[in-house]
């Protein structure tokens, strides 16, 4: 305990010093900055030799300290998640790497998913990224990405082959946004190899326009997480693409040749010892094409590497989007928008680079949301097995405080997290947390290692006092059933007013976790349509004020019962959630106020809206649609 406190103090002191240094005119060499940036008790930022055993930060599980009394502690959850994928028609096995053994790390990362209303009928469809295997497939039998159309009865129809999305390869992440502002949301999919930009034709089909859009890459890259964002606020969606490892299979050592091990088990080599990739930023030129501005925008001036997932949001309340990147085995990256077309990595100064005791973690997934309802966006990040997941609370001054242990997320360290999302599972107006787990190495099955390839999920209920309660074993069979999960998306696919999840798994059919609730609480959904801002409204911030009957225990007296959320192109691990923003309202009878801050700077205010309705709101404050959603006539 003494050393833990000492580490925290030193970590805070270093962060404070770096923050103050950034405000001075002192100029240091890159070498000096890196010396200051290295954790007091952490690992050195050096290249590990090829063939070294995988080094992952270890954290002891620890219960949270006693917090303020919570009105929900010990009360029934009131919701159950049930996997209805097969009954709903999601019967296609998703492929990724070897089933029992992998030669390369390439075979381990898995794919993302999207709840994606591609036909604009306000019923969520499902897109699943698919993968590949080293040995390949016979012609005509290649696994391809899948698109499932919502039948509005709880089931889906596979429309992949006529959609134009049947692309094969080592698929990774997906993100959604209307890059050409034609009113139809488009789809970007990252790959190990060439990425793919699919333009929505507005008739149920897509056209791949990667080359025409200027996104064709001149070399082999392992592209990872992606996000559309309007970083320069010109009304056109730009594109961020993370890069994991600069991987050449011809030169990457095999496990048995390089003695690559995990807890004594021979496994795929890396990422330590392998060259990290360089993240990419493409500026939308406004004519349907993009320009690579990665280097001049500051994407390559980072301490951390091995990028996996990302999240783009206004994390410092400046009105400009920043980018947070979960890096594997190195410090995280936090690109802060300089408002001049460039970014600076300020992860260390902001306190989001390392663990509480200043060590690099193996980050996987990222979700952003205001869990304590203080009007500032926080970050939750999944990490490797043996470590906690991370919860960073926004302090409002451009920095964050690691509240993992204080909030109750430090009790679990055994499972390996991938997908993650802030999600109001019970519509009480407070963001809960869902985590999808699954080990990276199939080789752990059948060994003496305390791990399994397929793992259950974590479900944390928000106690409204800054802490969470682990209710994983009470969340239903969809939570407790083991799965080889990777990315998942969140959305209300059956329009019944509660949030569901679709989970992409490796070498298995996906999961469709339907949320069955007995609570009958209020909610409101808001979909935005930009005019001066990008058409999708990505980057817009929505504030909802309603008397939810659930006091803000962590707020100052007199604080209104407000929630905030932003429209984002990606969420969790490699995935894209519903672009309709969902607010749980507990017992509220009406919405007192909706305030929308658009990327253009315009602010719209609407008052006295009804609950349990979908509102489609155009920039300028015009309500294009106001309807009560009719739940699916459930067959599944």
Predicted feature locations:
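Gly/Ser/Thr/Pro-enriched helix-cap/hinge segments flanking short amphipathic alpha-helices
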Residues: 67, 79-80, 88, 98, ...
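Short loop/turn motifs that recur once per blade in beta-propeller domains
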Residues: 80-94, 98-100, 105, 157-169, ...
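Beta-propeller blade termini
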Residues: 110-120, 149, 171-181, 199, ...
């Amino acid at each position: 305990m003494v050393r833990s406190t000492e580490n925290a103090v030193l970590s805070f002191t270093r962060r404070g010093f770096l923050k103050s240094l950034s405000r001075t005119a002192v100029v240091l060499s890159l070498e000096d900055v890196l010396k200051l940036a290295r954790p007091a008790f952490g690992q050195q930022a050096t290249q590990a030799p090829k063939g070294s055993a995988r080094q992952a930060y270890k954290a002891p599980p620890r219960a949270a300290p006693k917090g303020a009394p919570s009105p929900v502690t010990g009360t029934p959850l009131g919701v159950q998640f049930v996997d209805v994928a097969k009954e709903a028609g999601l019967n296609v096995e998703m492929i990724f790497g070897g089933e029992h053994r992998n030669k390369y790390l390439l075979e381990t990362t898995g794919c993302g998913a999207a709840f994606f209303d591609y036909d604009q009928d306000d019923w969520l469809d499902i897109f699943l990224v698919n993968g590949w295997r080293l040995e390949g497939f016979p012609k005509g039998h290649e696994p391809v990405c899948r698109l499932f159309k919502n039948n509005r009865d709880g089931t889906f129809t596979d429309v992949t082959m006529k959609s134009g999305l049947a692309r094969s390869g080592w698929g990774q992440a997906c993100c959604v946004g209307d890059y050409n502002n034609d009113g139809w949301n488009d789809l970007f999919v990252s790959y190990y190899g060439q990425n793919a930009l699919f333009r929505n034709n507005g008739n149920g089909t897509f056209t791949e326009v990667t080359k025409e859009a200027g996104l064709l890459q001149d070399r082999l890259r392992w592209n990872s997480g992606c996000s559309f964002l309007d970083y320069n606020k010109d009304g056109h969606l730009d594109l961020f693409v993370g890069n994991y490892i600069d991987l050449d299979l011809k030169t990457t050592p095999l496990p048995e040749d390089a003695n690559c091990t995990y807890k004594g088990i021979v496994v795929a080599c890396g990422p330590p010892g392998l060259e990290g990739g360089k993240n990419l930023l493409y500026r939308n030129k406004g004519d349907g094409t993009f320009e690579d501005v990665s280097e001049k925008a500051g994407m390559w001036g980072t301490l951390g590497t091995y990028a996996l997932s990302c999240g783009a949001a206004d994390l410092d309340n400046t009105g400009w989007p920043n980018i947070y990147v979960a890096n594997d085995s190195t410090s995280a990256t936090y690109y802060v928008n300089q408002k001049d077309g460039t970014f600076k990595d300020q992860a260390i100064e902001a306190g989001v680079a390392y663990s509480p005791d200043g060590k690099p973690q193996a980050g996987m997934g990222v979700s952003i949301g205001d869990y304590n309802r203080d009007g500032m966006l926080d970050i939750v990040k999944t990490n490797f097995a043996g470590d906690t997941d991370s919860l960073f609370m926004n302090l409002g001054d451009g920095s964050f405080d690691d509240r993992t242990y204080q909030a109750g997320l430090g009790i679990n360290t055994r499972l390996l997290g991938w997908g993650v999302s802030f999600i109001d599972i019970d519509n009480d107006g407070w963001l809960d947390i869902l985590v999808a787990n699954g080990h990276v190495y199939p080789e752990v099955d059948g060994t003496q290692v305390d791990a399994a390839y397929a793992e259950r999920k974590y479900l944390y209920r928000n106690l409204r006092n800054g802490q969470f309660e682990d209710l994983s074993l009470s969340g239903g069979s969809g939570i407790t059933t083991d799965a080889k999960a990777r990315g998942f998306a969140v959305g209300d696919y059956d329009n019944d007013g509660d949030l569901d999840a679709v989970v992409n798994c490796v070498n298995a059919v996906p999961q469709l976790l339907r949320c069955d609730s007995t609570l009958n609480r209020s909610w409101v959904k808001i979909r935005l349509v930009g005019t001066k801002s990008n058409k999708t409204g990505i980057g817009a911030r929505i504030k909802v004020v309603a008397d939810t009957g659930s006091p803000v225990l962590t707020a100052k007296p007199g604080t209104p019962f407000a929630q905030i959320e932003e429209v984002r192109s990606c969420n969790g691990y490699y995935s894209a959630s519903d672009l309709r923003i969902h607010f749980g309202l507990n017992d509220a009878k009406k919405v007192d106020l909706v305030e929308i801050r658009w990327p253009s700077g315009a602010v719209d205010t609407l008052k006295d809206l009804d609950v349990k309705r979908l509102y489609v709101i155009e920039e300028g404050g015009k309500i294009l649609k106001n309807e009560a959603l009719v739940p699916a006539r459930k067959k599944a």
